[in-house]
Amino acid sequence: MTDEVKKLKKLIDGTDNIVFFGGAGVSTESGIPDFRSVDGLYHQQWDDPPETILSHTYYERYPEKFFAFYRAKLLCEGAKPNAAHLKLAEWEKEGKLKAVITQNIDGLHQAAGSKNVLELHGSTLRNYCEKCGKFYDVSYIKHSQGVPRCTCGGRIKPDVVLYEEGLDEKTLYRAVEYIQEADVLIIAGTSLAVYPAAGLVRYYRGHKLVVINKTPLDRGLGADLVITGAVGETLAQL
């Protein structure tokens, strides 16, 4: 255990008010590619860049191509929670962790047993008919052909926030509240490149800001503790 991890353990042991803010790097150890990493979706062969394909305009204009990309790249049905997801669920059960705020859409925090998860960008596990509102699970989307259709004939839209779409205000508001009231705030596996989610960190008022990331963050966060490494690998030591 490194000195940094020992310091983190001391912080965790001494509090019952942790808030965890995570991004794609939390799920890479479950085999889900990081959208922006060098070997992630950005650098894989496709006609248009992922940000274009995953935009509201593209979804409306080219639904067939949108769903082809969506099924191929964003639906990771076989993925299982890793050490990071499991440790966070354990902390929640112990009453130490108050909330997980995630930029991920894979539902792995809930699969690990976490109850209070704020999904800033929605979830691939929820899908709704745009016409009648009927719910469909991820398996239906995965195994449907072309543009998925409801029994009523309406198009089914994944409950994920696309580029050009706004984040759910209620979820954002709750995230701000948890961050403001946190004793220890852990930011992990995120480049903090996407707004408004990335802007949430500025609401933290405490002095126990921990950053766990494989690569150093560009932003001057004034972190009190920085650990360079994989999130699951790090949390598994605690």
Predicted regions and their residues:
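Conserved catalytic core of sirtuin-type NAD+-dependent deacylases
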Residues: 1-238
